[in-house]
Amino acid sequence: MLKAPRFWYQPRSLLGGILSPFSFLYQIIVRIRRGLYAVGLKKISKFPVPIVIVGNITVGGSGKTPFVIWLANELKNRGFRPGVVSRGYGGKANRFPQTVTENSDPLQVGDEAVLLMKKIDCPMVVCRDRGAAVKHLLRNFQCDVVIGDDGLQHYSLGRDLEIALIDDRHLGNGRCLPAGPLREPKSRLNTVDFVVPKQLRPNEIYQLKNPAKKIDFNELKELTVHAVAGIGNPGYFFKQLETLGANVIAHPFRDHYFYRSEDFNFDDDHLIILTEKDAIKCKQFDDERLFCFSVDAVVPDQFQNDFFRLISNIILRKQAQREGI
């Protein structure tokens, strides 16, 4: 079981200070790499449809998956034809790019990809090479906008809009890896189109074995439960359950962990509540104690207004370019 080092989220720490020279070196490498793309020394794949990148500059969960679900479905509801590309982290398929379906195996395409596909009404392709994923998507589906899930640092994929998500831990101690949680310097946020705070709303709690069996949130008050989370920021999940009144026995696992039945061998009969990403990998277990806690992204109205105005203009501009207008 792994979690982010505590010193990443402390303003001052001995270990953070010791590692700061390595962070400085890391920043230099990141800036050089990005600069090579900016001046054309490394190739950027460009496409005839808008590419919207959703990501973050920190290691760990920032609510990307619920946000991408909301964005894909909202685009579809507004008459667009979205598609999603992702790395498919944790997937071990022999062939990529690979189209994700509702019946895809998380072991093959990754847990986040399977969760996304079960909750969005649009095509999705996974591949470590994001450009190859977009080519495969556009070759096989008629999409007019592509969402790049967790692609902020993948500069080989051209982009028209960038959305950076920030979670409740913000930027931690403000240092880059390994002294802090930042993948890129915090100044990177000045270059994206939107910075959106992570906000999740509880949706429902249902039993994995029988999804029709649900627990009302009021029933959680004073109830002792095992909370199991193999996500980037498990503390946020535990805090949500505590806010609803539950007495939480926390079990943080490493991100993208694949569970075994013995992981749930607790010496009591308390309910076991999982995140949606974890539940995807536990449906094969015949255990009536297993429940899933589903959430929805809450997105600011101002972002919605600005984003859909911009994306509409970009689509019209690209269409005019294709037609030579």
From Swiss-Prot:
Listed EC numbers: 2.7.1.130
Keyword annotations: ATP-binding, Kinase, Lipid A biosynthesis, Lipid biosynthesis, Lipid metabolism, Nucleotide-binding, Transferase
Keyword flag Lipid metabolism: yes
Any one Gene Ontology BP term: lipopolysaccharide core region biosynthetic process
UniProt-recorded Gene Ontology molecular function terms: ATP binding; tetraacyldisaccharide 4'-kinase activity
Reaction(s) the record says it catalyses: a lipid A disaccharide + ATP = a lipid IVA + ADP + H(+)
GO cellular component: plasma membrane
Residues engaged in binding ATP: T58, V59, G60, G61, S62, G63, K64, T65
Cysteine disulfide links: none
Name of the top EC class for this enzyme: transferase
Pfam families documented for this protein: LpxK
Pathway: Glycolipid biosynthesis; lipid IV(A) biosynthesis; lipid IV(A) from (3R)-3-hydroxytetradecanoyl-[acyl-carrier-protein] and UDP-N-acetyl-alpha-D-glucosamine: step 6/6
Function: Transfers the gamma-phosphate of ATP to the 4'-position of a tetraacyldisaccharide 1-phosphate intermediate (termed DS-1-P) to form tetraacyldisaccharide 1,4'-bis-phosphate (lipid IVA).
Record-stated family: Belongs to the LpxK family.
Entry protein name: Tetraacyldisaccharide 4'-kinase
Native species: Coxiella burnetii (strain RSA 331 / Henzerling II)
Native organism taxonomy: Bacteria, Pseudomonadati, Pseudomonadota, Gammaproteobacteria, Legionellales
